Curated annotation (Swiss-Prot):
AMP binds at S242, H245, G268, K272. This is Golgi-resident adenosine 3',5'-bisphosphate 3'-phosphatase. Residues 86-106 are annotated as: Disordered. It is found in: Golgi apparatus; Golgi apparatus, trans-Golgi network membrane. One of its GO terms (cellular component) is nuclear body. Belongs to the inositol monophosphatase superfamily. It is a single-pass type II membrane protein. Contains N-linked glycan resistant to endoglycosydase H. The gene is BPNT2.
Length: 359
């Protein structure tokens, strides 16, 4: 008796072959997709899997998580800043000239801090826009993971999720504020900063002092770990200003507020904002106002603006205009920062200061 077999018609053979090809195509395309995802092809620097709270289409992000990562980024960047300074090998160079004609300095501290801060934030939140002072080398990517834990001090202040669309978020990083002072070993002025703006408005700020390891953070309509002082003198104020143009501000300040006005020359915008607050750092000077009269970059001021705003304070141009943290990376109109005083009255008192800064 002949062995039993299965006969297929030519049509059956064709269907069988098509099914087989379909299975092979599905397996192969899935393999390629996995490989592309693994290597971050088609994504941002530091790509890969979407971070917490970030869907494939952009989705939403929780500002509490962004605050947690921002604090960690500022501290990690600060570790690099401190390590380089203590090694005394800064590899200092100039990126060019500032508008005032001074060298715009950069060191290994700037570069290494920037790398840590950028890739930590980018790995955690790949769908948000990140602006940073230093260039990010796309050929030197690093995946720096976050454990997705929100610290208890943040949860205590901000108990519920604060979701916003990822596409509305812009992050501003200053990996080393006060580079000039850093090269002079004036350590107290140095900070690392992260700011999160939503639709151009500063809502979250972190200022970290690497050499004293003090960190201030705040979220607008959320909470903070820093507070304003109990009183400020707006009649004869102590005014903190840039070391590079203290004389320019002093002349106008004395005319406006009188001879009892004190001018405090200082480095770094982060340090100057902290001078307005109740900071438990013995090296931190105290001021009533912060005035700046020349061009300044947004990564220098965004974190401080968010913190002041969260505490009921103000940071505006010298003419009283709010600062938008979208578009260009700098502002032309000078700067006035205050807390617990009549800010608009101060603006009206300083009508000529902006003109002085643009001679």
């Amino acid at each position: 008796m002949a062995p039993m077999g299965i006969r297929l018609s030519p049509l059956g053979v064709a269907v069988f072959c098509l099914l087989g090809l379909g299975v092979l195509y599905h397996l192969y395309s899935g393999f390629l997709a996995g490989r592309f995802s693994l290597f971050g092809m088609g994504g941002e620097p530091g790509g890969g899997a979407a971070g917490p709270g970030a869907a494939a289409d952009g989705g939403t992000v929780d500002l509490r998580e962004m605050l947690a990562v921002s604090v960690l980024a500022a501290v990690r960047g600060g570790d690099e800043v401190r390590r380089v300074r203590e090694s005394n090998v800064l590899h200092e160079k100039s990126k060019g000239k500032t508008r005032e004609g001074a060298d715009d300095k950069m060191t290994s501290g700037d570069v290494l801090s920037n790398r840590k801060m950028f890739y930590l934030l980018k790995t955690a939140f790949p769908n948000v826009q990140i602006n940073t002072e230093e260039h990010v080398d796309a050929t030197d990517q690093e995946v720096i993971l976050w454990d997705r834990k929100i610290p208890e001090d943040i949860l205590k202040e901000i108990a519920t999720p604060q979701e916003v669309p990822a596409e509305s978020v812009t992050v501003w990083i200053d990996p080393l504020d006060a580079t000039q002072e850093y090269t002079e070993d004036l350590r107290k002025y140095v900070t690392t900063m992260v700011c999160v703006a939503v639709n151009g408005k500063p809502v979250l700020g972190v200022i970290h002092k690497p050499f004293s390891e003090y960190t201030a953070w705040a979220m607008v309509d959320g909470g903070s770990n820093v507070k304003a002082r109990t009183s400020y003198n707006e009649k004869t104020p102590r005014i903190v200003v840039s070391r590079s143009h203290s004389g320019m501000v002093k002349q106008v300040a004395l005319q406006t507020f009188g001879n009892q006005t004190t001018i405090i020359p200082a480095g770094g915008a982060g340090y100057k904002v902290l001078a307005l607050l109740d900071v438990p750092d013995k090296s931190q000077e105290k001021a009533d106002l912060y005035i700046h009269v020349t061009y300044i970059k947004k990564w220098d001021i965004c974190a401080g603006n968010a913190i002041l705003k969260a505490l009921g304070g103000h940071m505006t141009t010298l003419s009283g205009e709010e600062i938008s943290y979208t578009g260009s990376d700098g502002i032309e109109g000078g700067l006035l920062a205050s807390v617990r005083v009549d800010h608009q009255a101060l603006v009206r008192k300083l009508p000529d200061l902006e003109k002085t800064g643009h001679k």
